[in-house]
Design a protein with these regions (language model features):
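Active-site loop/oxyanion-hole signature of alpha/beta-hydrolase fold enzymes
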Residues: 57-97
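Conserved alpha/beta-hydrolase catalytic His-Asp/Glu region
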Residues: 131, 150-200
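Catalytic histidine neighborhood in serine/cysteine hydrolases
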Residues: 225-245
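Catalytic histidine-centered segment of alpha/beta-hydrolase-like enzymes
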Residues: 242-255
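Short beta-strand/loop motif that positions the catalytic acidic residue
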Residues: 204, 210-212
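Conserved HGGG/HGGXW glycine-rich cap/lid loop of the alpha/beta-hydrolase fold
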Residues: 9-67
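Flexible "cap/lid" loop of the alpha/beta hydrolase fold
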Residues: 107, 111-112, 118-146
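Acidic catalytic loop of the alpha/beta-hydrolase fold
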Residues: 215-219
């Protein structure tokens, strides 16, 4: 595998071009970003894995350099797109680390295609459906403000703590693909909202780590033990004080936890 990031393309079953990127050395690690985000979601932490893993990222359909069809999206489709990338690379089995909506997509991959996943990390995510814990009405109202700048500030504060924001003014790579068309943004929102993997979770046979920030109210922290209890043999690790973007702000804690898990510790 290449050690320098570059963008190439795989073709999904419906002909949609899916952009993907490679970097690092070693066994493959598929990194899946959050809703309405492209591969830059991982910019702040990708180098942490470079010495021991070949990282594979992708731009979801509707984001980045990938095609942006107007047909419905779903986490099932995102999972199939990710597998198209692995197929293009000739990768039969990979470690998979999904955060937020990427964690929902990772659940589908691991549940429906267990032979493709060595180790699974589910970060700041939810099983969805009737069993998942939803964000509060207050959080929804803060994100739905007509004042777009106010809504963006609200999202930033859900992702990061005030202490972090005081020292890191941005721009932040976890705030959504700025060039994403409106139709794709709506389709991503619907795909995430309609996700329901509850019945699939017991079929996950990969060794699994569930990671979450204790102070995450964007995707409520109560979802983490729910996932860990539903997936056979899953481990649970809660990062004290972290909000949604625990993997970036609390990189010094989260990175070693993930690396130790990948190493079999």
């Amino acid at each position: 595998m290449t050690t320098a990031e570059n963008t190439k393309f795989a073709k999904a079953a419906d002909g949609t071009r899916i952009a993907y990127q490679l970097s690092g050395e070693g066994p493959e690690l598929l990194l899946l970003a959050g809703q309405a985000n492209n591969h830059h979601w991982w910019d702040g932490v990708r180098d942490d894995f470079a010495a021991v893993r070949t990282t594979i990222t992708l731009d979801y359909r509707g984001t980045g350099a990938s095609d942006k069809p107007t047909t419905p999206y779903s986490t099932e489709i995102f999972a199939a797109d990710a597998l198209s990338v692995l197929d293009e690379l000739g990768v039969e089995e990979a470690d998979v680390y999904g955060t937020s909506m990427g964690g929902r997509t990772a659940q589908i991959i691991a549940g429906r295609h267990p032979e493709r996943v060595r180790r699974l990390i589910l970060g700041c995510t939810s099983p969805g459906g009737d069993h998942g814990f939803e964000r509060s009405d207050a959080v929804r109202r803060s994100l739905g403000q007509l004042d777009r700048e106010a809504a963006r500030r609200a999202l930033t504060e859900l992702m990061y703590t005030p202490a972090w924001l005081a020292e890191h003014a941005g721009p932040h790579q976890t705030m959504g693909d700025p060039d994403m068309p409106d139709h794709a943004r709506r389709l991503h929102l619907r795909a995430s909202a309609e996700h329901d993997a509850w019945d699939l979770l017991p079929a996950i046979g990969s060794q699994t780590l569930v990671l979450h920030g204790t102070d995450d109210v964007f995707n409520p922290a109560a979802n983490a033990p729910l996932l860990a209890e539903r997936i056979p043999g899953a481990r649970l690790s809660m990062i004290e004080g972290a909000r949604h973007a625990y993997f970036e702000e609390f990189r010094a804690q989260a990175g070693p936890i993930v690396l130790d898990f990948l190493a079999g510790c």
